[in-house]
A protein has these predicted regions:
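An acidic/histidine-cluster motif and surrounding catalytic segment
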Residues: 1-22, 26-157
């Protein structure tokens, strides 16, 4: 959470129109497909606050186009783009989550679960079909080796 917070704060300080945040365990097997999807979304003029390039999405969600869905519940912060107009909202959400995570030690305050409330009220889009996923690795949150590939490449669960 803290590294994501720092990225957002830096983007705000630098007046960047967008920031794209990637975690270090990302796998992008089809980079040209992702680039084309993102370009089509940016050119479409659709309103969005956060564009998730990857995620572990759960139903219900709304299929908007062949390139993206609107999500209400999507785990992981593997890769995403945030518009400058949304920096303050996400910064506040992450700060609150960090404080409550430290105080309670409850994993429901981790960045990728704490922002569910934002997903329900604002516009979080996820690339569809998903092609990006996290490499198999040890999860500090789960305390074990995890492999999310199949979960992240499916939106119908």
């Amino acid at each position: 959470s803290m590294s994501h917070l720092k990225c957002l704060q830096t983007a705000k300080e630098e007046n960047l129109p967008y920031i794209c945040i990637f975690e270090d365990d990302i796998i992008i097997p089809k980079p040209n497909k992702v680039k084309n999807q993102v370009n089509r979304i940016l050119e479409s003029g659709i309103e969005w606050d956060v564009l998730l390039l990857a995620g572990n999405a759960f139903l219900p969600h709304k299929v908007i186009s062949d390139d993206y869905i609107c999500v209400n519940k999507c785990f992981t912060t593997t890769a995403y783009i945030v518009k400058s107009s949304y920096y303050d909202t996400l910064i506040d959400n992450i700060k609150k989550g960090i404080l409550l995570l430290i105080q309670t030690k409850n994993s429901s305050w981790t960045i990728d679960t704490n922002w569910f409330s934002l997903m329900r009220q604002d516009t979080f889009l996820l690339l569809n079909p998903p092609t990006i996923y996290q490499m198999e690795d040890y999860s500090d949150i789960e305390g074990k080796e995890v492999n999310y590939k199949d979960l992240m490449l499916s939106i119908d669960k």
